[in-house]
Amino acid sequence: DLDKKQDDLHEMLDLILDYVEEPQVEQEKPFAMLCTLLASDKYLGRCLVGRVEQGSAKVNDNVKAINLLGDKVESGRLTKLFKYEGTDRIPVDSVNAGDIICIAGLAETSVSDTICNEINETPIKSTPIDPPTMSITITVNDSPISGLEGKKVTSTLIRERLLAEAETNVAIS
């Protein structure tokens, strides 16, 4: 009933479950997932988030990343696997098609790259990331009031902050 005020979203979520089809997954095919998000962990480094489109994978499996053209970006090993359940990230030993996961072990892979087993040559279709539209040049501040406003304004600290942000932000390259 649209006129009645609701306390929660249960009715809407039930409608979504009733009318939205489940995603089609292919368990039999070799492992493949599309990287849709970058994450960073202070112990694991760069992590990649996405949904497993097909197959399954285990910790220590050898995988490769390929770009939208099918060119190899890098090879590596799945050092850690996490599965998302709601907003919780839970460490697991294996993942299957349909799971939303986070993986560690690939440092050069980015959003829109396909992570797959080593025999797969076909990338998952995705929208390419737009190239940067702006660039900046940072130079030494030779103003007479340099260093008087702000605490972290040295070039080294700014560089460290930009590199840290580039780990999880695809808009910075």
Task: Annotate the PLM regions.
Residues 1-173:
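Structural and coupling elements of P-loop NTPases
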